[in-house]
Amino acid sequence: MDQTIDWWPSPAKLNLFLHINGRYPNGYHQLQSLFQLLDKGDELAFTVTPHAEITLLTPIDGVANEDNLIVKAARLLQTHTGCSEGCDIQLRKVLPMGGGIGGGSSNAATTLIALNYLWKCNLSLTELAELGLALGADVPVFVMGNTAFAQGVGEQLTPVNIAQKHYLVVFPECHVSTAEVFNAPDLPRNTPLISWQEYDFDQTHNDCQQLVCNRFENVANTLRWLLEYAPSRMTGTGACLFAVFTSNQEAENVLANLPSGCSGFVSKGVDVSPVHDKLAHLGSIS
C-alpha cells in the first residue's frame, strides 16, 4: 500500500466503569461511566474528490457500505454543511466489531473530524460532537477527544485527567448485542449516582457484566482467567474485557499466555485522543 497515504487514527476506548442509574421516558438509559481513550485503534485515510460521491474502498465483511458509520458520518457532514465535494475512504480495521471498545463510533468521529478539516467545513468540535450524537451515543466522546466522565445517556462529558495505566484488552471472539443487553429485563437499572470526586476503580463496577457473563460462558471464563493476573472488568456491553497494569511489560507477559479462542492487544491510556494530536500537528483544532 502506498506509504504516502495520510492515515488518521481512530482510537479505541474503555469504559472503566458503567453504572446504569435509571431509564428515561423515551427508553434510553440514564448512566454514568468513565471513558478512557487508548493509544491504539483503527486507521482511516481520505482522498477528497471533486464529485459528491462517498466511496468506502475497504468494505467490512457483513456490513453493507450504506450501513457503515463511516459512510453515514461523511454523508451527514456533507448534508449538514452543503459541501459539494466527496471522498474515497480506506480503513485499516484493527478493533473487533461488537466488542464494546467503540470501533464504529470512533470511526465515525474520525471521519467527521478529518473531513471537516479536508473539506474546510470549519465546524467547531462542539458542533461536530452534536452532529455525531445522531450517529451514536459514544460518538461525541471520540469527537471531543478527552478521557471523560460521562452522564445522561453518555453525552454529558466532563474531561478528566487520570493516572495513565497500561491495559490488556481481550476479545473472547463472540458478539454481544448492545440492544439485547439494554433491553434485558434482568439488567440492573438502579445504581445510585456518584460524583466524579467519588470515583475509585475498586468501588465501581459494570452493571452489564454479570448479565453478559451469565449468557456467554466464554466471556465469564476469560474474565475469571484475567482476574488471576490483575484487576479486570468488561467494557461497555461487551464482549471485550480489560485488565489494568502499571507497566507495559506486565501486560505483554499476560498477553503471551492468552487462552485459545481469544485475541487481544496491549495499549496505554491517554488523556487526549491521537486524532486530536494529529489536528494539533496540522495546526487546526478548536
UniProtKB/Swiss-Prot annotation:
Transmembrane segments: none annotated. The active site is at residues 13, 138. It catalyses: 4-CDP-2-C-methyl-D-erythritol + ATP = 4-CDP-2-C-methyl-D-erythritol 2-phosphate + ADP + H(+). Pathway: Isoprenoid biosynthesis; isopentenyl diphosphate biosynthesis via DXP pathway; isopentenyl diphosphate from 1-deoxy-D-xylulose 5-phosphate: step 3/6. One of its GO terms (molecular function) is 4-(cytidine 5'-diphospho)-2-C-methyl-D-erythritol kinase activity. InterPro entries: GHMP_kinase_C_dom, GHMP_kinase_C_sf, GHMP_kinase_N_dom, IspE, Ribosomal_Su5_D2-typ_SF, Ribsml_uS5_D2-typ_fold_subgr. Keywords: ATP-binding, Isoprene biosynthesis, Kinase, Nucleotide-binding, Transferase. Its EC number is 2.7.1.148. PANTHER family: 4-DIPHOSPHOCYTIDYL-2-C-METHYL-D-ERYTHRITOL KINASE, CHLOROPLASTIC (PTHR43527:SF2). This is 4-diphosphocytidyl-2-C-methyl-D-erythritol kinase. It comes from Pseudoalteromonas atlantica (strain T6c / ATCC BAA-1087).
